[in-house]
Design a protein with these regions (language model features):
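C-terminal membrane-cytosol helix-exit motif in multi-pass small-molecule transporters
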Residues: 177, 181-189, 202-234, 238
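Extracytoplasmic gate region of multi-pass secondary transporters
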Residues: 30-34, 253-292
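C-terminal ends and interior cores of transmembrane alpha-helices
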Residues: 89-120
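Central cavity-lining transmembrane alpha-helices of secondary-active solute carriers
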Residues: 54-75
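Extracytoplasmic
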Residues: 11-41, 142-146, 278-286
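Cytosolic juxtamembrane N-terminal segment immediately preceding the first transmembrane helix
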Residues: 1-23, 115-118, 123, 252-257
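Glycine-rich segments within core transmembrane alpha-helices of 12-TM secondary carriers
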Residues: 161-186
Length: 292
């Protein structure tokens, strides 16, 4: 008998899809804030203005590099739901640092450090750390969501269909985020008039929304899926293959023994570098052409 999709069966899938939308949305918001923050935080910087602005994206994606593998181990240890909630809490903390950076720049804008001939306010460094936390959260959430969506037994669907739908929603978030930055966060404001106080309310609202989503997730029924994570604690970066020894025990091989995985890692490294480099620095180039 063919099972039909119900709200109960689709609930975890829809919840994770919505969180994946948030990941795409905030990833692009972070990158598109480089231009306005270049004026709000770095107006007194001359020689290294673009370099410091680009560090915002560098800090964000540094979170992926340093914390993805750790999240995999955490997932094996505590399961999907607890890892998901911790990931969301990191996102709330990152937005709190964003908010703090705006408040410090607004009320203590004269506090900062001199780097060479340039003055860099403390608010910039706080935003930079918040960007790292946001990247860490995005990496953690992807480690949780991707395998869960692929393995979740939603009636009448295939893994590739579920992944395509979830990724499409994620891409929709990245598509509308620039309009949010220009049409909401800095609506009706010229580049010359951009200031840190315009960041306060948007970041506060986003932080409250993510905090509510985290609370809702903690109350939701998010079942663990058997056979999708390593239960033992002494195995790292290994997969089981078919038995081939005399005793019939399964042999273990490193995941790096798979050639196509190595090629995929190299490919996605260059792809993401190109995607982020062009997308996040195009606005900086446009601002330079306009004399900002």
């Amino acid at each position: 008998m063919k099972q039909s999709i119900t709200l109960r069966s689709a609930g975890p899938f829809l919840l994770l899809t919505f969180i994946y939308f948030i990941v795409g949305f905030l990833t692009t918001v972070n990158g598109q804030c480089q231009g306005p923050l270049k004026i709000a935080f770095l107006s007194e910087v001359t020689t290294t203005k673009n370099s410091l602005a680009t560090l915002i994206s560098f800090a964000f994606f540094l979170g992926y590099l340093l914390n993805s593998a750790k999240t995999g181990r955490l997932l094996n240890k505590v399961g999907y739901k607890k890892t998901l909630i911790r990931s969301m809490l990191v996102m709330v903390l990152g937005l709190a640092f964003y908010l703090a950076s705006a408040l410090i720049a607004e009320y203590w804008g004269g506090a900062g450090v001199h780097i060479s001939q340039d003055f860099v306010p403390f608010g910039y460094f706080i935003f930079l750390f918040g960007s790292y936390l946001m990247g860490t959260s995005a990496a953690m959430l992807q480690v949780v969501i991707n395998p869960y969506i692929a393995a979740y037994p939603l009636p009448g669907t295939q893994p590739v269909q579920r992944m395509n739908f979830t990724c499409a929603v994620n891409s929709f978030g990245t598509t509308i985020a620039p309009f949010f930055v220009t049409g909401v966060m800095f609506a009706g404001v010229s580049l010359d008039s951009v200031s840190a106080d315009q960041l306060t309310i948007p970041f506060l609202v986003m932080m409250l929304i993510i905090a509510f989503t985290t609370w809702s997730t903690s109350k939701a029924n998010l079942p663990d899926i058997e056979g999708t994570r390593e239960e033992t604690q002494d195995v790292e970066s290994e997969v089981k293959t078919t038995p081939s020894d005399d005793s019939g025990n399964a042999k273990k091989r490193s995941i790096w023994s798979f050639r196509h995985l190595k090629y995929g890692v190299i490919t996605i490294f260059f792809y993401v570098g190109t995607e982020v480099g062009i997308g996040n620095n195009m606005n900086l180039h446009a601002m330079d052409l306009m004399g900002h």
